[in-house]
Amino acid sequence: MKAQELAVPGDTVWIRGGTYKANPDKVARTQRIWSYIYYFGKSGKAGQPIRYWAYKDEKPIFDCSEVKPANRRINAFQVMGSWLHFRGFEVTGTQVNFKGHGQSCNVENHGSHNIIERLSLHDSQAIGIYALDGSDNLFLNCDAYNNYDYTSEDARGGNVDGFGGHPSKGATNNIFRGCRAWFNSDDGYDCISAREVVRFENCWAMYNGYGPKFEKHGDGNGFKVGGYGNTPLQPVPNPAPRHVTEGCLAVRNKASGFYANHHLMGGDWSYNSAYRNSNDFNFLMRPPDNSEEMDGAGHRIVGNLSYRGIRDVTKLNAPKCELKDNAFATEKKFTDTSFESLDEAALVGPREADGSLPKVAFLKPKDAKLASEAGYTAYAGQKPPSK
């Protein structure tokens, strides 16, 4: 990429609007089983990031649909450098091209001190953003939607999450903030096998585990927060990281809205709202040796709200958790008229001019006191203590 070759720390590479069709004959790098369509290996510096930004209000679209190397995993944007800032473009059409187990990614990050902002990752067979190595990264105001792997593993779509946060040991302070995930064939957000803490702040998850016509696909959790698989012999960290999920919203996901996923440590769950999921909140855990399932213990559960889930709260050992100011449907006699709006269409509407989430009244209690104490509407503009 000529622009990357010429860029130095402090530069901004402006990307003009229009559709950029990735050329199958000009893949940036092939390495082992991977093909990287665009590869970013050059770093900026502290206070002098290299920026790759959409020009003004123009809309660049990177269409990767024609890149289909046989028997390779395909990553559209492979980010290996640090002190980089990507903003304001779309990635679409990233393919899967083999039948066995594997995955493709629209964006995969390994660098540190990066900001990935206002990207739209959609209508592909690939994970939206997949974060592995690197520290101090912010994934800000991004959307991942309509992503479904219909090629590998009998087309069940089980590897395509909207956002994956799976940091390796030492990869600390990685945050997903203001993001949306909907109609991804597996989970909205997933941090299974994370070796360090992952934070989800003010993020939304809708209709995951389904296709756009509500055809059933993969697991279908809104927020899958933790876990290390089902095999006790799998090496696990001790202690496991204590993940943070606050100010988030989960709507009509196929499985759980918020799911502890057999994690080995309690989590911090503050000011989240769940609506019409199979399980609105599922706190299932395992002990530190990963040996057996148990009801969740050691969780801090403050100011959360649920309504119309098939199960409101499940797999929770309440006496062994801290619970405060929650408005769960089993305790509050809500009706549809208890809320200012239940208009789900507003949740996938256009973002604000600055890239922030659309301003909606969805699932906001009409009771002003309750609206200030519980649910994602109580979180706006706050940073409630997590520990």
Segments from the language model and where they lie:
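A structural signal for beta-strand register positions
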Residues: 19, 56, 90, 120, ...
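Right-handed parallel beta-helix
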Residues: 21-23, 28-37, 66-191, 197, ...
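Short, T/G/N/S-enriched strand-turn elements that build extracellular solenoid repeat scaffolds
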Residues: 2-6, 23-43, 191-193, 235, ...
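Acidic, glycine- and Ser/Thr-rich low-complexity intrinsically disordered tracts
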Residues: 11, 21-23, 29-32, 158, ...
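Beta-solenoid repeat scaffold
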Residues: 9-62, 79-87
